A protein has these predicted regions:
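Glyoxalase I/VOC metalloenzyme domain signal
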Residues: 2-71, 78-159, 168-243, 254-377
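Short, solvent-exposed loop/turn elements at beta->coil junctions and helix N-caps
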Residues: 74-76, 164, 247-252
Length: 377
């Protein structure tokens, strides 16, 4: 019997488990909620984008999505290291961050996140462009989330760190572990109840502002090379359970395909789908294209929940200049919709949104925007 290469590294538990697991597809998948979270995970807390110009980027997103500025940390607040802005609409919170020149940074100062490394930030932007750096999850105890997740194989990035909020007299505790690629999973706890990250200067919303009706993050989708290995890693460190799954047979076309699994926390308010490319189609999988353009795994898209999608769409179209919508489908597509989902919408409403069937008997109206940056999120 031949011997293995002495330099071969043993397979991790996650890799071994991934090799054993098989996708069954949407039709054969049976959803069960085992309430398996390994620590108390509540909801999405915030999403942080790393960008080259936080000032112009937050203004674009704020205008295009109807999300007013809720807090800032920049030179006007005494932060000489970086500019960072928080937008909020209901429970939906986006943070946009970019460093100032490292040569101008002053020691001490009012930087809520003094650990932010400008070199690492610019390397991230060079590779990924405008993209999501952190997916923040609200947890009961950030230190406990760190202890349990790292004990179960999470690759630590930032140990539990306390950020004081002078305005409210409260404090926030957060920590970070690797999620996929250069994206981190950020656990957020503590007594601070404001939006985003503590230590920022709160901003009052414009008088009479009602926004566009966006109220929370529905799900955050990642693209990876190996779906099962990634899913097993996420399940192992958090205890998340499988909420849904789709194979190329379910959601692919003759041109392009993908496999996808959706993970959820106990309450199923945190939904985190993960996609991988499939091969053998006429065209390259859109997931493979993303992985190439993003120079590796990353967060592909964010789904934003609204209680009135028609109001939101009309407001976004009226604002213009923020986001472009994907082209409408053909007339033949809309003509067939009533026989698929009934007459819950009028013919005019069918043309205003696109409808997708996520599961049998489960239909949701969607309207897709073009990417926020070429080839990225």
């Amino acid at each position: 019997m031949g011997k293995g290469n002495a330099n071969d590294e043993p397979l991790s538990d996650v890799t071994v488990e991934a090799k054993r697991r098989k996708l069954v597809g949407c039709k054969n998948f049976q959803r069960v909620n085992p309430k398996s979270d390994k620590f108390d995970i509540k909801r999405f807390h915030h999403i942080e984008f790393w960008c080259g110009d936080a000032t112009n980027t937050y203004k674009r997103f704020g205008h295009g999505l109807g999300m007013p500025l809720a807090a800032r940390s920049d030179q006007s607040t005494g932060n000489s290291r970086y500019a960072s802005y928080t937008l909020r609409s209901g429970e939906l919170v986006f943070v946009f961050t970019s460093p100032y020149s490292a040569a101008c940074a002053q020691p001490g100062g009012a930087a809520p996140m003094p650990w932010l490394d400008a070199g690492r930030h610019w390397e991230f932007v060079r590779k990924h462009g405008l993209a999501v750096r952190a997916v923040g999850l609200s947890v009961a105890d950030a230190a406990e989330a760190w202890r349990v997740s790292t004990a179960n194989g999470a690759r630590g990035v930032l140990p539990p760190t306390t950020i004081e909020d002078p305005e409210s007299g409260t404090a926030q505790e957060l920590c970070e572990v690797e999620l996929y690629g250069d994206v981190v999973l950020r656990f957020v706890g503590g007594t601070f109840k404001g939006p985003g990250i503590a230590g920022y200067k709160a901003e009052a919303p414009p008088e009479g502002s009602t926004g566009f009706g966006l109220n929370r993050l529905d799900h955050a989708v990642g693209n990876v090379h190996d779906l099962l290995e990634q899913v097993n890693y996420m399940e192992k460190i958090t205890g998340f359970h499988e909420f849904a799954e789709f194979t190329a047979e379910d959601v692919g076309t003759v041109d392009s395909g993908l496999n996808s699994m959706v993970l959820a926390n106990n309450s199923e308010f945190v939904l985190m789908p993960v996609n991988e490319p499939t091969f053998g189609t006429k065209r390259k999988s859109q997931i493979q294209t993303y992985l190439e353009q993003n120079e590796g795994p990353g967060l592909q898209h964010l789904a934003l929940k609204t209680d009135d999608i028609f109001r939101t769409i009309r407001a976004m179209r009226s604002a213009s200049g923020g986001f472009d919508f994907m082209p409408r489908a053909s007339d033949a597509y809309y003509a067939k919709l009533p026989e698929k989902i009934g007459d819950s919408l009028t013919p005019e409403q069918y043309k205003e949104v696109e409808v997708t069937r996520s599961q049998e008997l489960f239909y949701r109206p969607w309207l897709f925007c073009r990417e926020g940056a070429p080839g990225r999120t």
